[in-house]
Amino acid sequence: MANNEGIDNSFLDTVKFDAKGLVPAIVQDHETGKVLMMAWMNRESLEMTLERKKACYWSRSRNKLWLKGESSGNMQDVYDILIDCDGDTLILKVSQIGGACHVGYHSCFYRRVLENGNMEICDTLMFDPEEVYGKKS
């Protein structure tokens, strides 16, 4: 049974953005709990995500809003958003269309570290990034 006593229900005012106005968002498959990726959100991307129910992030490399799947078609339908006890980290539970990772895998966490220190691929390749984004020059 949920107990809402003492909880400030104003979500956006509860989020503690860092000095750059960002908060980390861990993205999970809403059915399996599998971690798909980690991305950054600012207030505007979070508001857009809440409004559209499609994941929108802040691209630090491009310095602009990034609607996930906008160029690749690999959208994320948002089912749930959780906030941690400190208010400084989010979890987005999504339905992933295609791969979450820009290199083509279902999850960005597609490499497992072995006991000997080597790595192995532990996930499914969903698409060829050159076909989706074009060849890197």
From Swiss-Prot:
Taxonomy of the source species: Bacteria, Pseudomonadati, Chlorobiota, Chlorobiia, Chlorobiales
Recorded metabolic or biological pathway in which this protein acts: Amino-acid biosynthesis; L-histidine biosynthesis; L-histidine from 5-phospho-alpha-D-ribose 1-diphosphate: step 3/9
Predominant place of localization: cytoplasm
Gene Ontology biological process terms in this record: L-histidine biosynthetic process
Domain of life assignment: Bacteria
Cofactor(s) listed in the protein's UniProt record: Mg(2+); Zn(2+)
Family, as annotated: Belongs to the PRA-CH family.
InterPro entries assigned: PRA-CH, PRib_AMP_CycHydrolase_dom, PRib_AMP_CycHydrolase_sf
EC assignment: 3.5.4.19
Keyword set includes Transit peptide: no
Function as written in the Swiss-Prot or TrEMBL entry: Catalyzes the hydrolysis of the adenine ring of phosphoribosyl-AMP.
Catalytic activity field: 1-(5-phospho-beta-D-ribosyl)-5'-AMP + H2O = 1-(5-phospho-beta-D-ribosyl)-5-[(5-phospho-beta-D-ribosylamino)methylideneamino]imidazole-4-carboxamide
Gene name linked to the record: hisI
One Gene Ontology term of the molecular function aspect: phosphoribosyl-AMP cyclohydrolase activity
Subunit structure: Homodimer.
Binding site for Mg(2+): 84, 86, 88
Note describing how the cofactor binds: Binds 1 Mg(2+) ion per subunit. Binds 1 zinc ion per subunit.
Record localization: Cytoplasm
Binding locations of Zn(2+): 85, 101, 108
Protein known as: Phosphoribosyl-AMP cyclohydrolase
NCBIfam families: PRK00051.1
Gene Ontology CC entries for this record: cytoplasm
Record keywords, A-Z: Amino-acid biosynthesis, Cytoplasm, Histidine biosynthesis, Hydrolase, Magnesium, Metal-binding, Zinc
